[in-house]
Amino acid sequence: MTEPLRIVFAGTPEFAAEHLKALLDSPYQIVAVYTQPDRPAGRGQKLMPSPVKQLALENDIPVLQPPTLRNAEAQAELAALKPDLMVVVAYGLILPQAVLDIPRLGCINSHASLLPRWRGAAPIQRAVQAGDAQSGVTVMRMEAGLDTGPMLLKVSTPISAEDTGGSLHDRLAEMGPPAVLQAIEGLAAGTLEGEVQDDSLATYAHKLNKDEARIDWSRPAVELERLVRAFNPWPICHSSLNGEALKVLAATLAEGKGAPGEILGASKDGLIVACGEQALCLTRLQLPGGKALNFSDLFNSRREKFAIGTVLGQTADAQ
């Protein structure tokens, strides 16, 4: 009877934890988990373990959290695990060539885009922001470059006009694990060939930045509507209203002309705000100290705040 493959898993956020769950339910042996060091989170800024670390500890899997894999000590620690394969999903650390060379079958990565489009840190949100018609998961063999390795397997899904960064994330987190298991099976059997990426088609998905979430009302409404969806649930698009922060969680396209940021109308259907081209109808908002509400609820209780002619974003936006 052949021994099960010895797999080292490396990942950090919830997207990665979904992949680890599938591997823990597989016939493979997960010998260790690598994840980012605990980070301060929440109002108290307490050190919090990553979702991957929490799952590993619940299943009695050894957890390693080196700040880097570039030094000889960290590489020797990995080599001592004698891995057949390393599976990497949204880990957040660069793997140098010396690490990629350690596992017998190499290292594979599950990336949340249809490579070579959207290499980099935020492929899900950038796909929604760009108005892409589809997204997916690519399982690739890792190289020293960022998301540049040969593609072993791809699965795709349409991006709907209602998709947010959150809804697309959740869908891809379901699609990725079966694709990884299929790729492992093919690699172990020696039946899977990699397809070289066409670098001329590559685009880069820059890391999300809170400053990007500040709404510039001079931009076309079609761009802002996609931005609102892409940045939900994080970092959430925002503006200001009479000097107060205003978070925008949902919006639709609307007709109307006016100065960028000018309130053109308000009803239970939403708050109509002029943009550089067309207008946005803001349908879900959050005011300071309150919870996110549909605009119909705000309109009933705070109608006076949304006077026609008021201009959003005139003062410095709160973070």
Curated annotation (Swiss-Prot):
Pfam families the UniProt entry points to: Formyl_trans_C, Formyl_trans_N
Taxonomic superkingdom: Bacteria
Molecular function GO terms recorded: methionyl-tRNA formyltransferase activity
InterPro entries: Fmt (IPR005794), Formyl_trans_C (IPR005793), Formyl_trans_C_sf (IPR037022), Formyl_transf_N (IPR002376), Formyl_transf_N_sf (IPR036477), Formyl_transferase-like_C_sf (IPR011034), GART_AS (IPR001555), Met-tRNA-FMT_C (IPR044135)
Gene Ontology CC annotations of this record: cytosol
Enzyme Commission code(s) on record: 2.1.2.9
The keyword Protein biosynthesis is assigned to this record: yes
Catalytic reaction(s) noted: L-methionyl-tRNA(fMet) + (6R)-10-formyltetrahydrofolate = N-formyl-L-methionyl-tRNA(fMet) + (6S)-5,6,7,8-tetrahydrofolate + H(+)
Enzyme class (EC, first level): transferase
Listed CDD domains: FMT_core_Met-tRNA-FMT_N, Met_tRNA_FMT_C
Role, per record: Attaches a formyl group to the free amino group of methionyl-tRNA(fMet). The formyl group appears to play a dual role in the initiator identity of N-formylmethionyl-tRNA by promoting its recognition by IF2 and preventing the misappropriation of this tRNA by the elongation apparatus.
Family stated for the protein in its record: Belongs to the Fmt family.
HAMAP family: Formyl_trans
Protein name (database record): Methionyl-tRNA formyltransferase
